[in-house]
């Protein structure tokens, strides 16, 4: 399908609209002018016919001359006087061009008629004349040639005006459309440059049109988001590759040990197998968490949501954690009010354990963790507090980014891969919640989850 240029479409549409509008306007004006002019011609003919009638009432017929009749006639008029027996008595005109013979029985036509003769239209008015010494009638013949010429001139003027207005409109439309489409052409060229050279170029358009400037700003914002998404994707691949490379290198190294000495040394074989299994489990966990970050949406969650009793779930998880980590102190301050939320039960358990696991990893000295729930303004609030190393303020905006670690030198020894908080944040957001953090170095961290 052949596409037309926006500028050409604009010129064609505006020109056609202007031409049709002016043409219709001129037709309406001409219609009213024709009616006005025609009525004026009829009034002139009626006036002359009435003057002729008055002339016959003012003096005897024998005293009426052709000069008297001509004095009562206007331009382009002819008068014929008949007696009661249809005998022609007078015929005179002020204009030699008016010479028309009605050519039919005058007695039977209406008072006012139109008749075309040799290409010219005439008004014919029949007026009865009855005086003391005369009885008959007059035929006033009024030529409409001048009227027709004026109407033709009006049509020509209207057409010329329409053509001139159309040309002017087309010229203005061309200039205006060029000014409008010029930024769009620049926008298209910039897009091509960005596609060729990358995200480093941004649109720099300063026009007099708010819409074009808004379009350019929106495009720049969109490109910034795409660039950010691209960088995140690239960083994600790099981080994932790095996270997978380390355990794979460890496994490869121990397999080489087994190949060299493990066949003969059971201790080396046992140690290498245990480490390889541990690193393999780390890889499996990393892959599972990566999959968790890339699946699920709001519709799926809402369709499988169940009522989760927050306090009951926390008590159950804390009981298990006390058995698993007997060296840690778990304190709870749970509200007496019933806290319920609609979500997948395993997701609540998952996000709760992520925060508890995070607290355990970074509170190896005091080993004291507190969980608190409360209801405020219909908001269900869960607070998890540890007394560990804390999070620097400059890192707090990034801790939910994938693979981000506050202390990169300690994270691997603590078993973290920087995905847990990202997963927790995603679960909270998909269920309509939010999360806040409050932390001080060497004093601890509090995560506040709000539903």
From Swiss-Prot:
Which EC numbers does the record give? 2.7.13.3
Q: Which Pfam families match?
A: ArlS_N (PF18719), HATPase_c (PF02518), HisKA (PF00512)
Task: Indicate yes or no for the key word Kinase.
Answer: yes
Q: Where are the transmembrane segments?
A: 11-31, 156-176
Does the record bear Oxidoreductase in its keywords? no
Q: Which residues carry this modification: Phosphohistidine?
A: 242
Question: HAMP domain: which residues?
Answer: 178-231
Tree of life domain: Bacteria
Q: Where is the Histidine kinase domain?
A: 239-451
Query: What are the entry keywords?
Result: ATP-binding, Cell membrane, Kinase, Membrane, Nucleotide-binding, Phosphoprotein, Transferase, Transmembrane, Transmembrane helix, Two-component regulatory system, Virulence
> Could you state one GO biological process linked to this protein?
phosphorelay signal transduction system
Note the topology in the membrane. Answer: Multi-pass membrane protein
* Protein name (Swiss-Prot/TrEMBL): Signal transduction histidine-protein kinase ArlS
- The gene is arlS
């Amino acid at each position: 399908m052949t596409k037309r240029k926006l500028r050409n479409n604009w010129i064609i549409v505006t020109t056609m609209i202007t031409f049709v509008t002016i043409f219709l306007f001129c037709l309406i004006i001409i219609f009213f002018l024709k009616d006005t002019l025609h009525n004026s011609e009829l009034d002139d003919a009626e006036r002359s016919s009435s003057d002729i009638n008055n002339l016959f009432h003012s003096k005897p017929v024998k005293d009426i001359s052709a000069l008297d009749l001509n004095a009562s006639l206007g331009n382009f008029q002819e008068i014929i006087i008949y007696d009661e027996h249809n005998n022609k008595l007078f015929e005179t005109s002020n204009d030699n061009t008016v010479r028309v013979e009605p050519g039919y029985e005058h007695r039977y036509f209406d008072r006012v008629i139109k008749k075309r003769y040799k290409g010219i239209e005439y008004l014919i008015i029949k007026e009865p004349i009855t005086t003391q010494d005369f009885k008959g009638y007059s035929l006033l013949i009024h030529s409409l040639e001048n009227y027709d010429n004026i109407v033709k001139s009006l049509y020509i003027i209207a057409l010329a005006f329409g053509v001139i207005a159309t040309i002017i409109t087309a010229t203005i439309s061309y200039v205006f459309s060029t000014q409008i489409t010029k930024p769009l052409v620049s926008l298209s060229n910039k897009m091509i440059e960005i596609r060729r050279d990358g995200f480093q170029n941004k649109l720099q358009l300063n026009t007099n049109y708010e819409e074009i400037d808004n379009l350019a700003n929106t495009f720049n914002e969109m490109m910034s988001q795409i660039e950010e998404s691209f960088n995140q994707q690239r960083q994600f691949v790099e981080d994932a590759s790095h996270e997978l490379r380390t355990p794979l290198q460890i496994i490869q190294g121990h397999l080489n040990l087994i190949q060299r000495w493990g066949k003969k040394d059971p201790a080396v074989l046992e140690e290498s197998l245990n480490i390889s299994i541990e690193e393999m489990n780390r890889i499996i966990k990393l892959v599972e968490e990566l999959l968790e970050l890339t699946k699920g949406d709001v519709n799926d969650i809402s369709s499988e949501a169940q009522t989760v009793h927050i306090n009951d779930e926390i008590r159950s998880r804390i009981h298990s954690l006390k058995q698993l980590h007997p060296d840690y102190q778990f304190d709870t301050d749970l509200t007496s009010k019933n806290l319920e939320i609609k979500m997948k039960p395993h997701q609540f358990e998952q996000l709760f354990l992520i925060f508890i696991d995070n607290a355990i990893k970074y509170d190896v000295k005091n080993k004291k963790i507190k969980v608190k729930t409360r209801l405020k303004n219909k908001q269900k609030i869960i607070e998890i507090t540890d007394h560990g190393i804390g999070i620097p303020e400059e890192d707090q905006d990034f801790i939910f980014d994938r693979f981000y670690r506050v202390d990169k030198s300690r994270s691997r020894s603590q078993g973290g891969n920087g995905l847990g908080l990202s997963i927790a944040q995603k679960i909270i957001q998909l269920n309509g919640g939010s999360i806040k953090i409050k932390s001080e170095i060497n004093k601890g961290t509090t995560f506040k989850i709000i539903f």
